[in-house]
Amino acid sequence: MIPKNPRQLADLVLKPIITEKATRLLENNKYVFEVVPQATKPDIKAAIESLFDVSVIKVNTVRPPRKKKRVGRFIGYKPLYKRAIVTLQDGDTITLFPEV
């Protein structure tokens, strides 16, 4: 269910992910964001379109497996997260780095 409140839409997208692979995807007009694990593809599409005022063509999601983390003799896990790869329409861009 797509939330109608703009504040709820803004809470779905946590932060942009800037890695080598994500930077290569920028050339194909694809942007990578970390989103809450419960977010669905229509929710992510509505959130990106309302936050950045762009047209989204496609949304792909990835939930990488959790990694083990050891603290002393105790073994725990890193938190679960979800990535969204958002493809924008030609001509639309998102400014991740504001120009100084």
Swiss-Prot record:
One of its GO terms (molecular function) is rRNA binding. It comes from the Bacteria. GO terms for cellular component: ribonucleoprotein complex; ribosome. GO terms for biological process: translation. SUPFAM superfamilies: Ribosomal proteins S24e, L23 and L15e. Keywords: Ribonucleoprotein, Ribosomal protein, RNA-binding, rRNA-binding. It holds the Pfam family Ribosomal_L23. Belongs to the universal ribosomal protein uL23 family. Part of the 50S ribosomal subunit. Contacts protein L29, and trigger factor when it is bound to the ribosome. One of the early assembly proteins it binds 23S rRNA. One of the proteins that surrounds the polypeptide exit tunnel on the outside of the ribosome. Forms the main docking site for trigger factor binding to the ribosome. This is Large ribosomal subunit protein uL23. The gene is rplW.
